[in-house]
C-alpha cells in the first residue's frame, strides 16, 4: 500500500478559541477555514490543511491521517481493514472527497486519503508567519504498551 506521508491530524478540543490561540497564535499554523465548531489549519509549506480542530466535550485525537499514492491504495486499505476485521467507513471533509477511517487493533483512529484540494502557495509570505512559523506536519509520536508488537504489525501490514 502506497502511503506517501503524514497528511493531517484531527483533534477534538474542549475550547476551540483557546486551541486556535495556541496552534495559530503561538505555534504559527495558518488558519485556512473556520466554521461553526471547526477550524482547518496548515503549515506554510503545505498545499492542503493538516490540522483540524473540532469543538467537543472531551479532548482527544479523532484521527491520524495519511496520504496515499493512488486511488487503488484506498481500495487496498479497505480490503486490509475488512480482512483484519477492523471497523472502517468512508467520509468526506472540506477539500477531501474521500477519507477512509479505520480503527486499528491498537486503538488508534487512522484515516487515509488520496486527493485533496490544493490551497494557495504561501511559503514566501514571511510577513504572515507567527511564532516559529510551522512549515509542515511531518510525523506523529504514538505511545503503546506493546511497542514491539505494534511496530511489527505496521511493518508487515502497511509497510
Regions found by a protein language model. Give the residues of each.
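Class I S-adenosyl-L-methionine
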Residues: 24, 75-78, 82, 155
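Conserved short beta-strand elements that form part of the metal-binding/catalytic scaffold
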Residues: 30-62, 109-116
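Short, amphipathic alpha-helical segments
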Residues: 71-75, 93-96, 131-134, 141-148, ...
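DNA polymerase sliding clamps and clamp-related checkpoint/processivity subunits
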Residues: 51-60, 64-69, 74-78, 89-92, ...
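Non-catalytic surface loops within mature trypsin-like serine protease
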Residues: 15, 45, 55, 68-70, ...
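Vicinal oxygen chelate
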Residues: 78-136
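Core segments of cupin and vicinal oxygen chelate
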Residues: 1-48, 91, 101, 142-159
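N-terminal beta-strand motif that seeds the catalytic metal site of vicinal oxygen chelate
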Residues: 1-17, 61-66, 117-148
Amino acid at each position: 500500500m502506497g502511503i506517501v506521508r503524514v497528511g493531517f491530524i484531527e483533534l477534538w478540543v474542549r475550547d476551540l478559541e483557546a486551541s486556535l490561540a495556541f496552534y495559530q497564535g503561538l505555534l504559527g499554523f495558518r488558519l485556512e477555514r473556520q466554521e461553526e465548531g471547526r477550524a482547518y489549519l496548515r503549515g506554510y509549506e503545505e498545499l492542503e490543511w493538516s490540522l483540524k480542530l473540532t469543538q467537543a466535550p472531551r479532548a482527544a485525537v479523532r484521527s491520524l491521517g495519511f496520504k496515499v499514492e493512488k486511488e487503488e491504495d484506498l481500495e487496498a486499505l479497505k480490503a486490509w481493514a475488512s480482512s483484519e476485521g477492523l471497523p472502517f467507513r468512508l467520509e468526506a471533509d472540506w477539500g477531501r472527497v474521500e477519507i477512509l477511517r479505520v480503527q486499528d487493533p491498537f486503538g488508534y483512529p487512522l484515516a487515509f486519503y488520496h486527493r485533496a484540494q490544493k490551497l494557495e502557495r504561501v511559503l514566501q509570505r514571511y510577513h504572515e508567519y507567527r511564532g516559529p512559523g510551522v512549515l509542515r506536519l511531518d510525523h506523529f509520536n504514538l505511545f503503546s504498551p506493546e511497542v514491539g508488537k505494534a511496530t511489527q504489525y505496521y511493518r508487515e501490514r502497511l509497510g
